[in-house]
Amino acid sequence: MVGGSTVASGVEMEDVVKRIKANVRIPVIIFPNNIASITGAADAMWFMSLLNSANTYYLIDSQAIGAPMVKKLGLETMPMGYIIVGYGGAAGYVGQARVIPYDRPELAVAYASAAELLGMRYIYLEAGSGAPQPVSPIMISAVSKYCKSTLVVGGGIRDAKAAIAAKIAGAQIIVTGTLVEEESKVMDRIREITTALTAQA
């Protein structure tokens, strides 16, 4: 996944994607914050709606503006309902989200259910980059129980313990973005997390 809440340059985004693809043999998926994130250099993109935003730009306007470009580029799209909870971080601030409190899992279930009924194949529960605590296992479990869409969870997951807790609760994809930016021995930490998750399977 390549992207973030403060990406402002399409040229920069394309350069980053090309550099990654030149060094890593795995698909690169765009995690967009607006139309500046779109690049044909990627393999696919999350075509997402920030469901609890108070601003229609993040709900549907940016998607409508960007859709013709996405179709022209022939990018594979992965429809996602994006839900910001708890801390929220930069994503919550930039996206003008009405952040769902950690202790209100029923609200997350309601938004996730709406995403599923709208045909979104993925649901992302986001606590925000660098969140002091991750999405609670109770909230993850509640959404997993009521929704069949693939469940993505991110924000505040810094170690194997937190990743395993999210997986046991029902997360099917786990995002550890800020870890790459903050950890000096990033490969060791990622290996620790992936090894623990594989062993828990």
Q: Which residues fall in each region the model found?
A:
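Structural preference for beta-strand elements that scaffold enzyme active sites
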Residues: M1, P27-I29, A44, M80-I84, ...
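Metabolite-binding pocket within alpha/beta catalytic cores that recognizes anionic/polar moieties
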Residues: M1-D61
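Glycine-rich phosphate-binding active-site loops on the catalytic face of alpha/beta enzymes
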Residues: M1-V7, A44, M48-L59, A127, ...
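Glycine/Thr-rich beta-alpha phosphate-binding loop at enzyme active sites
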Residues: G3, V94-I140, E181-E183, R189
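Alpha-helix-loop-beta-strand connector modules within alpha/beta enzyme cores
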Residues: G10-N34, G66-M78, Q133-D159, I190-A201
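Catalytic cores of alpha/beta
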Residues: I30, N34-F47, Y146-T176
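Conserved anion-binding
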Residues: S37-E116
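Alpha/beta catalytic cores of nucleotide-metabolism and tRNA/nucleoside-modifying enzymes
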Residues: T77-I83, G88-G89, D103-A110, K145, ...
